[in-house]
Each structure stands twice: as structure tokens, then as C-alpha cells.
Amino acid sequence: ELLPSALDLVDGETRRALAVGGPDGAALLIGVDGIPEQVDWQCAEVERILRPQGLVDARVLDGDARDAAWRARGALGRGAFAETAAVMKWVVLPAQVADVMEQGAAAAQRAGLPAALAAHAGVGVVEAVLAGGGVTAAVATVLTEWRALVRAAGGQALVESAPLAVKERVPVWDDPGPALRIMQRIKSQLDPAGLLNPGRFVGGI
């Protein structure tokens, strides 16, 4: 039975940051675990399934190369570029991951800002990183466009890191919708005087 331990879709910029080799363009990183025989079978099965779907290059990373690639994937927000302007997390349905990544890359390209996009494709969580060097207005514009396209897909977007000047233009938290009223009531019960970090949480709570 094919049971991948990881299923990450990465764009070309992320692929270069991970130094996994292969042709330019997007890549699907698939983690498999088990005894050597299980791992070999799963790798062969993955290739058998994906070849008819357009797979053009398949390679197995093991040992230090594998560990380095997954470490770099985990540190993408800090390591994709020499300088990072902002990191945003998107949450969408898994079936929409590829589309929103493509739209997000196009938005960054229009603004002239390099971007690295990577997703835990099986659960619909996308990490979007903007390279530093851009002016505040351009960074804020891209983050705003990203949030709009994620919302259009029925998802939510969170600004994980950005300079204060950008956060003053783009809310860190997305609109929580009707749930905000419930959270406000809970907050008022737990902190009636409004002393605990007022305005720091979603919806200005």
C-alpha cells in the first residue's frame, strides 16, 4: 500500500532553494518511510502512477541529500532568498492548491518581486515567501492580491512575517467571518477590562 509521509508541491524558485536538482519548474516532493524493501517499492509505484500523468523527471534523495532538502523545506521562509520581505500562509482545499499557487506566482511576477511557493498539498496549506528588496507599497500590494485570490478560492490567508510598515497596510489576520462575534464574547468574559494585548488578535480582539 502506498502511504506517503509527505506530499509537498513546490515551485521552481523553491526547488532551487532546496537544491534537489532536475529540470526547471515545479516539483512534487514525496516522502516515504519503512524498511528498504518497502521504500524501494513505494518509489517505483509513485513513478509508475505519475509517468502517465506527465512526469518528466524522477529522482530519489537519500541520506544527507534527503535530510538537507527537508530541512531547507522547513526553513523556506528564512532560506528561500538572501533577504525576505514577507511570508504568508494560505489555507485552501487541497484540490485548489495548484491553481492558487499559479495565480500567486503571477501576482508576484506582475509586481516584479521574486516569490517562492510551497504547499503541503495533501492538506491545502501553502507557504508563500516574497524576496526582500521591494518597496513597501509593492510588497503590500502583492500580499493584498494573494489574500484576495485565496479568499476567492474559499480559503484564508495569514501574514506570518513582514515589516511593521507592511503590516500597517495589510492586516495580519484574515476576516474570521461570523465566528468573530463568538470570539469577541469569549474575550470579553475572560478579559473584561481589555488589558491582555488589545487589538493584537484576529478582528482587532
Tell where the protein language model's regions lie, with residue ranges.
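Conserved glycine-rich FAD pyrophosphate-binding loop
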Residues: 10-12, 21-23, 47-205
